[in-house]
C-alpha cells in the first residue's frame, strides 16, 4: 500500500531541540523555526543586476545551486556509487519491504528501491526545491504509486508519517570526511525514534582513515621559502595547519599527482550505523604511527571506506583512479602538518622504522577533527601533545 499523505505540519518544539544538536544542515534546507537559522539567500541576489538570470534559478537558494553544481551531478554520475547501493538494496528489498530514505535529494536511491519491488518507499528531503524535483523524477518514472516524498528534515519525521516502521533505512549523507554531513547523528536520531530492532540500515559500516604523505606538488602550492636568493619564509607564519581542506579545492586529484604514503593507514574510527553513537568516538585519541618510509610528511591525507555485505564504497585515491565523478563529489581531504607550535611551521620528518605519536582531537559533534604530532622528550621518546585541546 502507498504511504499516507501528510501536509507539511507545524513543527514541534522538540524537533528544534533535535536539530540543534546536529552540526550539519544540508544546503537549501528549510529550517525557519530552528535556533540561529537564517533563510537562504535567493540566487538572483548574488548576481549583478546587469547579468540575466533564468527564471528557473532566480529564487532558488544560492547554497543549493552551488551544492548541486559542485557535487550533486558528479554524485549522480558516480556509477560505482550507484551500483554499490543498487546491489546492497537488491539483497534486502522484497515485495514486503518498506523503505525509508533520509536526505533523498534527487530521489535516485528511492527510485532504485521502488524499481527493485519495495512495497512502499518514503523519501525525506529537507530542501523544498529538491523535494519538488524528486517528485518530478518519480512522476517521470511512473513510480508515484510506490514512492512518496516528504519535505521535512528527518529530525521532524514522526511515525505518523510512515505506513509502518520501515524494514530498511537508506541514506547517503556522507561528506569528503565520512561524518562531515553528520551522517551518524541523523541515522542515530531516526534509529532511536522510528526503527524496529530488525530494520536493516544501508549502508551499515564505515571507517575513517588517515595517512601521512609526502607530496611535493601539494608542498609547492601550500608553502613558500623564497625566490632565487630572496628569503620569503616569514610568509609561512600564515600557513594553515589547522583546517582540513578538500583536495579538489586545491585543484588536484590525489591519484593524478605523485605522493608517498609514509606509514600504514591509521584507522581513526569505525562506525556501525546500526548500533554506534556519537559518544563511541572519543573526543581525543592517540595513535602510534610507525614510519615505513623516510621522508617529509607534508600533510595528513584523509579518506574513508563504507561497506555492506561484500560491497565496498571507497574514497581511497587508489580506488578512484578511474572514477573522476567520485573525486569531484568527495575526493579526499588534507591537513597540512606542523612538528611544533613555534612562530613558523616546522617540517614533520619521518625516519623509516621510527615510531611517532599523533593526537587526534574531535569537535563535539565529531564532524571536524585535527591531527597533531606529539613532541619527543629529551630521551627521544614521544610525549603527550601540549597544544590547545578541549
From Swiss-Prot:
Q: Where is the composition biased (Basic residues)?
A: 1-11
Q: What EC number(s) would the UniProt record show? A: 2.1.1.-
Q: Can you supply a Gene Ontology BP term from the record?
A: peptidyl-arginine N-methylation
Q: Where in the cell is it found?
A: Cytoplasm
Q: Does the keyword Cytoplasm apply?
A: yes
PROSITE patterns according to UniProt: SAM_MT_PRMT
Q: GO molecular function: any one?
A: protein-arginine N-methyltransferase activity
Give the matching InterPro entries: Arg_MeTrfase, SAM-dependent_MTases_sf
Region called Disordered, residue ranges: 1-20
Report if keyword Iron is assigned. no
What GO CC terms are in its UniProt record? cytoplasm; protein-containing complex
Keywords, ordered alphabetically: Cytoplasm, Methyltransferase, S-adenosyl-L-methionine, Transferase
* Active-site residues per Swiss-Prot or TrEMBL entry: 172, 181
Residue ranges of domain SAM-dependent MTase PRMT-type in the record: 55-372
Q: Which family does it belong to?
A: Belongs to the class I-like SAM-binding methyltransferase superfamily. Protein arginine N-methyltransferase family. PRMT7 subfamily.
How does the annotation summarize its subunit structure? Answer: Present in large multiprotein complexes.
Q: What does this protein do?
A: Arginine methyltransferase that specifically catalyzes the formation of omega-N monomethylarginine (MMA). Has activity toward multiple substrates in vitro. Able to mediate the arginine methylation of histones and myelin basic protein (MBP) in vitro; the relevance of such results is however unclear in vivo.
* Protein's UniProt name: Protein arginine N-methyltransferase 7
Species of provenance: Trypanosoma brucei brucei (strain 927/4 GUTat10.1)
